Amino acid sequence: MGNTFGHLFRVTTFGESHGGGVGVVIDGCPPLLEISQAEIQAELDRRRPGQSRITTPRQETDTCEILSGVFEGKTLGTPIAILVRNKDTRPQDYQEMAQVYRPSHADATYDAKYGIRNWQGGGRSSARETIGRVAAGAIAKKILQQVAGVEIIAYVRRIKDLEAPIDPNTVTMEQVESNIVRCPHPDYAEKMIALIDQVRRDANSIGGVVECVARNVPKGLGSPVFDKLEADLAKGVMSLPATKGFEIGSGFAGTLLTGQEHNDEFYSENGDIRTVTNRSGGVQGGISNGENIIIRAAFKPTATIGQAQRTVNQAGESTILAAKGRHDPCVLPRAVPMVEAMVALVLCDHLLRDRAQCHLLT
């Protein structure tokens, strides 16, 4: 229950943080798509732990194995299974958490729902689950780029109260990947890195905002009323660990404007209907309008920290916990490829649905 995402392009993730491995089964991928292990690995490398001093020190290569669905470099149209084996596991670091609940983590709610949980690194609630999403997202990105020229770029917009002035319409992947925090503004990137360094030394954590832009998205993706494109984007992004908020276009700031100020006026560009502004964020009436889709996701501070906090054990007795283990002082740098993956999965699924419904007879 709750482990499968999508309608026509369906992904099912599996595995746990300190188990044998994690992975994904992708069903509905069209045949004859050229895809390599290296292309998928490149996305996983952006997500993997231990990539810099401001991420978790857990050392995993996250090397992916394509078990099925790809032959001689092309997809078969059959289920694609991808596996990443866990190597650097330390379940003993979490022994204390077998009985004690981490504040703001999934420990207590998993116990309340299932009556049992894998306490080793959070099990299924760990961010390692997102390996499968990023692997599937690499394939979705390839489909979107090849079919429609879609480009998806996410980046760190804000860490705590440091918000970088970034134009999503011009930002490049090279700018994003030019530093370890994945903020395309070099001056703010230095400040963000320094802040995360300090928080790490304090055995604490901080959160922030990832912004993502999808360019060249075809018009017509999304379906009213319950399958609106922004609704599915929100569901996909908000299903990522540590997310606490979602915005598209003007978002909450749009509530401060009048209708005249907020409306995106239309004009014709060589017969193509465009908008003068893009406060709608590329989606109107739940359907893409051809403008850049711009979304933002709020990520809370990492729940597992080394500072002492009040909590209770499974018996309901009060205790103090200073968590052990290896954790990100800030999830934002590694969340960037995760957000890109979820946006890609949603857009790819809607692209296939749109082609099936609206272009069969045209």
From Swiss-Prot:
Pfam families: Chorismate_synt. PROSITE patterns: CHORISMATE_SYNTHASE_1, CHORISMATE_SYNTHASE_2, CHORISMATE_SYNTHASE_3. NADP(+) binds at R47, R53. One of its GO terms (molecular function) is FMN binding. Pathway: Metabolic intermediate biosynthesis; chorismate biosynthesis; chorismate from D-erythrose 4-phosphate and phosphoenolpyruvate: step 7/7. SUPFAM superfamilies: Chorismate synthase, AroC. The keyword Transcription regulation does not apply. The keyword Lyase applies. GO terms for cellular component: cytosol. Gene3D superfamilies: Chorismate synthase AroC (3.60.150.10). Reduced FMN (FMNH(2)). FMN binds at R124, S125, S126, G285, K300, P301, T302, A303, T304, R326. Its EC number is 4.2.3.5. GO terms for biological process: amino acid biosynthetic process; aromatic amino acid family biosynthetic process; chorismate biosynthetic process. Its cofactor is FMNH2. Homotetramer. Belongs to the chorismate synthase family. HAMAP family: Chorismate_synth. This reaction introduces a second double bond into the aromatic ring system. This is Chorismate synthase. The lineage of its organism: Bacteria, Bacillati, Cyanobacteriota, Cyanophyceae, Gomontiellales. The gene is aroC.
